[in-house]
């Protein structure tokens, strides 16, 4: 029986302990425990409290954030709806029905009181976005923008409610630039100008970097001119660098060189990077203003010094000013490696030989940077296209003798060196590189390496070495139906020597690799030339029969006038009169434009 009394006493104590009086109205009591919810109802008409019951009155100004499983949440559920505080549902009580408008204001103010700053911003922004959602659509890219930036951009477009500034636009443009949305970026900068909001260097840097990314040199050039002429903004180093890169990627070497020299000779770029002289608002300073600003800044520093020896101070300051002016005049030191690399690449694409060599040697003499493989490949390619094998050998020997640069030598550099030698048929030097340098540097020749050497052998009619290289390519599986040049060079090395059997072998390999019909016809014609020089006219007729069979199988394949000329010569030399007359009539009926050899045969056989 005592246990029963103790049980009831414990329950009563527990109920009393769970009660708390409100600090504002002592008669209003509410419970913390859910299972005591319906025990006492002090005031039925009382509105439901908006704040969760575990909050004390003294903590209303600060809403704590709790953490659970490394994720944060606040007192409001993530799915909460702000409109619920307006009591628009059907379950409004009698108290709210009496003064609905007052209740809305009261509850919304109370709700805002318990919100932190980010929740207040979301609460206001959602209403604005609902009104302005139909005015402008945000570009949907493959990597869509975060929701926060979408809201920022929508707010920028709703200019009636938001006072957009250059800083706000730059923030949105930065997000757009990271996502790569060029059309949205151009739309943003157009909106800035339409609202008379002046873009700054950051704005132009963001939009120009996207133009550089997508190789839109025309758009970048228009924006660059607008920045200088319309907005009166002097480009800084980064703007110059972006434009040089843009011109280099599109192969416009002349424009890349023009901007490179402007960057070199622009004193304000040097000033912004090292002298730290503030620009005027309209950015219209000239070289005299630069010197005046330097003197003015140094005179201000001079006034702050408490030194009685004015003459010595003046001399020291004058020397200091002179050194700064000399630094501005000596602008080559400010050019960074990336700009040298881009302008050298542009010179190579545009085949500007002298300019490319000039900038490459400047880069070497500066001593600040070590050229990368990219720069070496471009400069050797430029040398090979112009056939300057002497300078190519000079650069190559310097690379090879320098342990820091030797590691940069690769197959592409050796190929370009061989290409420069092939233009002048320097076979001895080319063979020395082929036999020694590849092995010494532990490099394996690729398809292009064999092709360059085959071209050299074809020029000097060295069919034996050419055929040997061709067999090596076949063994190393470097031959394919995508590249016909090794086949042509090998056959051409046999044309003047009359070694037709080598040419026939190369032709059979090409047929096994399933070359296209037109490519095969080219190889057939070169093989027929080799047969003509070796007086093997019967082989020419046999090859012609193969071409007839190919034409019957593929109606799109047509034998050209060069092939018919070789066959006509074979009929003439073999005294096959009727076949000669028939083929001659076919040539006349088709109204071909006769090559010199065919015209000669016609003139020699008028009475045939």
From Swiss-Prot:
It is found in: Plastid, Apicoplast. One of its GO terms (molecular function) is RNA binding. PPR repeats lie at residues 165-199, 200-230, 236-270, 336-370, 372-402, 410-445, 446-480. It holds the Pfam family PPR. It comes from the Eukaryota. Keywords: Apicoplast, Plastid, Repeat, RNA-binding, Transit peptide. Transmembrane segments: none annotated. GO terms for cellular component: apicoplast. InterPro entries: Pentatricopeptide_rpt, TPR-like_helical_dom_sf. NCBIfam families: PPR. Binds to apicoplast RNA transcripts, preferentially to the motif UUAU, and protects RNA transcripts from degradation by ribonuclease. PANTHER family: OS03G0856100 PROTEIN (PTHR47447), OS12G0638900 PROTEIN (PTHR47447:SF17). Homodimer. Belongs to the PPR family. P subfamily. This is Pentatricopeptide repeat-containing protein 1, apicoplast. It comes from Plasmodium falciparum (isolate 3D7). The gene is PPR1.
């Amino acid at each position: 029986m005592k246990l029963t009394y103790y049980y009831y006493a414990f329950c009563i104590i527990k109920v009393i302990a769970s009660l708390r009086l409100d600090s504002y109205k002592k008669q209003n009591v509410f419970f913390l425990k859910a299972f005591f919810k319906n025990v006492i109802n002090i005031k039925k008409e009382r509105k439901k409290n908006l704040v969760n019951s575990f909050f004390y009155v003294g903590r209303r100004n600060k809403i704590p954030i709790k953490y659970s499983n490394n994720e944060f949440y606040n007192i409001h559920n993530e799915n909460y709806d702000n409109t619920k505080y307006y009591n628009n549902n059907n379950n409004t009580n009698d108290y709210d029905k009496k003064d609905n408008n007052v209740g809305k204001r009261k509850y919304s103010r109370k709700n805002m009181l318990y919100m932190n700053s980010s929740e207040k911003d979301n609460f206001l922004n959602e209403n604005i976005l609902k009104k302005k959602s139909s005015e402008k659509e945000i570009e949907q890219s493959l990597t869509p923008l975060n929701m926060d930036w979408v809201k920022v951009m929508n707010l920028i477009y709703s200019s009636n409610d938001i006072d957009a500034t250059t800083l706000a636009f730059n923030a949105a443009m930065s997000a757009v630039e990271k996502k790569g949305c060029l059309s949205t970026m151009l739309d943003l900068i157009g909106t800035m100008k339409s609202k008379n909001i002046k873009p700054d260097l950051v704005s132009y840097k963001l939009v120009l970097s996207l133009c550089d990314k997508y190789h839109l040199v025309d758009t970048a050039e228009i924006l660059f001119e607008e920045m200088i002429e319309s907005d009166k903004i002097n480009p800084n180093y980064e703007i110059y660098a972006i434009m040089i890169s843009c011109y280099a990627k599109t192969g416009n070497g002349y424009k890349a060189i023009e901007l490179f020299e402007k960057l070199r000779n622009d004193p304000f770029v040097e000033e912004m990077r090292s002298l730290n002289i503030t620009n005027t608002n309209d950015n219209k300073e000239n070289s005299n203003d630069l010197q005046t600003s330097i003197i003015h800044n140094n005179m201000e520093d001079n006034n702050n010094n408490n030194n009685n020896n004015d003459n010595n101070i003046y001399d020291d300051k004058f020397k200091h000013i002179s050194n700064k002016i000399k630094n501005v005049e000596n602008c080559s030191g400010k050019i960074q490696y990336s700009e040298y690399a881009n302008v050298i690449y542009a010179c190579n694409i545009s085949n500007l030989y002298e300019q490319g060599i000039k900038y490459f040697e400047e880069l070497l003499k500066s001593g600040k940077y070590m050229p990368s493989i990219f720069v070496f490949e471009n400069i050797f390619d430029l040398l090979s296209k112009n056939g300057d094998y002497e300078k190519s050998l000079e650069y190559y020997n310097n690379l090879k003798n320098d342990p820091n640069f030797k590691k940069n030598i690769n197959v592409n550099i050796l190929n370009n060196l061989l290409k420069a030698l092939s233009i002048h048929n320097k076979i001895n030097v080319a063979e020395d590189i082929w036999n020694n340098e590849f092995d010494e540097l532990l490099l394996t020749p690729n398809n292009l390496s064999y092709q360059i050497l085959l071209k050299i052998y074809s020029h000097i009619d060295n069919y034996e070495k050419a055929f040997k290289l061709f067999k090596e390519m076949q063994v190393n599986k470097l031959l394919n139906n995508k590249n016909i040049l090794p086949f042509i060079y090998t056959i051409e090395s046999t044309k003047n020597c009359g070694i037709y059997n080598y040419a026939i072998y190369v032709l059979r390999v090409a047929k096994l690799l399933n070359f296209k019909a037109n490519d095969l016809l080219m190889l057939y014609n070169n093989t027929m030339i080799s047969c003509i020089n070796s007086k093997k006219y019967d082989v020419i007729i046999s090859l012609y029969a193969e071409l007839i069979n190919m034409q019957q199988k593929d109606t799109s394949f047509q034998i050209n006038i060069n092939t018919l000329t070789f066959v006509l010569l074979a009929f003439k030399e073999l005294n096959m009169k009727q076949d000669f007359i028939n083929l001659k009539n076919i040539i006349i009926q088709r109204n071909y434009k006769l090559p010199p050899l065919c015209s000669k045969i016609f003139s020699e056989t008028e009475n045939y």
